Amino acid sequence: MLSSMARIAIIGGGSIGEALLSGLLRAGRQVKDLVVAERMPDRARYLADTYSVLVTSVTDAVENAMFVVVAVKPTDVESVMGDLVQAAAVANDSAEQVLVTVAAGVTITYLESKLPAGTPVVRAMPNAAALVGAGVTVLAKGRFVTGQQFEDVLAMFDAVGGVLTVPESQMDAVTAVSGSGPAYFFLLVEALVDAGVAVGLTRQVATELAAQTMAGSAAMLLERMDQDRHSAEVAPLGAQVDVPAAQLRATITSPGGTTAAALRELERGGLRMVVDAAVQAAKIRSEQLRITSE
């Protein structure tokens, strides 16, 4: 559990920064232990008025913070590094302050090369669903991060949804599946709504049906995954584990029925190949945007 005394500085009050701020407050974090750095005056006023949080400069926000979350766009990271380095220089022990980056493509080695030696760095990739507390954040830790520090960061992001950990080498793949993933689902909903209108539904009804169907299907899948995890704990070593999505699809598909007819058309249209190509393209683009150490 994240210490109630740990001060958290959020650098950047955009959508992800606000999602983390609101999530931490919902989880019971005291507003006095949170501070935000935001350069846009209108945005700063909005955050201060909405959450009663202190909004200040980067240098002031970082001072005395145990965790510094860099939630700016990748193109803005370089501009805040000077302030972060300056603040770290006056700190008593840089190893006590953990820097967490949620900026896409900004690598741990890049940040370690800019900050004082031994600074703990964690890379995080949340997705857009964090805005409603239902996201998933994937974390990768740097070489100077202690076990307790990493547990604290896990607890921090648990306030905005699920949390997974991977080696940093997999973060581009994570970006392609999860970071960009919500847009894939929105596009699928768009297509499903348009198809619903084409067969006689109103757009409002089709949208409600599509959205609720997506939400319910996701809930079914998550429940099955929990059941499978429990089964795996008692299963013999090496036992085959089925893909839960495939299990559920088979369960609700009656031979010769309407669902089978629809799935046949999706397979004939190359849905799997298109999804694979999309994820590959996103991964390649993430690699191209990567910011590494000089």
UniProtKB/Swiss-Prot annotation:
EC number: 1.5.1.2
Keywords of this entry: Amino-acid biosynthesis, Cytoplasm, NADP, Oxidoreductase, Proline biosynthesis
Principal EC category: oxidoreductase
Amino-acid biosynthesis is among the record's keywords: yes
PANTHER family: PYRROLINE-5-CARBOXYLATE REDUCTASE, PYRROLINE-5-CARBOXYLATE REDUCTASE 3
Protein name, per record: Pyrroline-5-carboxylate reductase
Compartment list: Cytoplasm
Pfam families, per database record: F420_oxidored, P5CR_dimer
Residues spanning the signal sequence: none
Similarity annotation: Belongs to the pyrroline-5-carboxylate reductase family.
UniProt gene name: proC
Catalytic activity: L-proline + NADP(+) = (S)-1-pyrroline-5-carboxylate + NADPH + 2 H(+); L-proline + NAD(+) = (S)-1-pyrroline-5-carboxylate + NADH + 2 H(+)
Superkingdom, natural source: Bacteria
GO BP, sorted A to Z: L-proline biosynthetic process
Gene3D superfamilies: NAD(P)-binding Rossmann-like Domain (3.40.50.720), ProC C-terminal domain-like (1.10.3730.10)
An example Gene Ontology molecular-function term: pyrroline-5-carboxylate reductase activity
Function (record text): Catalyzes the reduction of 1-pyrroline-5-carboxylate (PCA) to L-proline.
Listed GO CC annotations: cytoplasm
Matching HAMAP family: P5C_reductase (MF_01925)
Pathway field: Amino-acid biosynthesis; L-proline biosynthesis; L-proline from L-glutamate 5-semialdehyde: step 1/1
